Amino acid sequence: VKRAEALSIPIIVDEAYGDYMPREQSALTLAPNYENLVVLRSFSKAHGLAGIRAGYGFMPKQLTVPLDNITHPYICSSPARLVAQAALEDEGFLQKTRRLTAQCKRPFLERSWRHLTVSHTSPETPILLLTHSDSKVNLKKAFDPFRIKVVSGTAFVGLGANSVRVRVPGEKDQKAVLEAIDQIDLLS
């Protein structure tokens, strides 16, 4: 960030899942020290408000001027703004969301499989990264018969088809997803 600042290059940090992490782990803790840091957040993840298509950003004042030149003040509807404001004021909802997410994620972190590993992420983050030890296994295709939506590792730099990103299921779907993973683990 410091080097980019010396070159007048802004650094943009996407914290779409930022509401799931402890505040001290946010890039926002760095903001007072840098004039080139932009941190973006979304209402679509922890707040569950994907339908309002709204987000927000933290940035130094001087970076708002270029942004004002490429956008307009009505990019977000008035009802969406009211919903977003109410969401920001409801810290209790976020605490409950983080607690429930951790509770639903725990069985996946405590379980061990022969061929599958779960990469370490915060217990409160609602995503899992599964990787099969056999690089020839296409995990996305393996999940297809179970009708479980996953994102192939090929969508991410450094990962292959033997990895998938899985959204942590709610309590009612947990057993079915765990059973599917148990069966997929048998592939080799």
Question: What does each of the following model-derived ranges do?
Answer:
Residues 1-2, 27-31, 64, 85, ...:
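Short amphipathic alpha-helical segments and helix-helix/interface helices
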Residues 36-113, 118-120:
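PLP-dependent aminotransferase class I/II
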Residues 51, 124-125, 158-160:
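Short acidic/glycine-enriched loop/turn segments that link adjacent beta-strands
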Residues 86, 107, 111-115, 138-148, ...:
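Generic non-transmembrane alpha-helical segments
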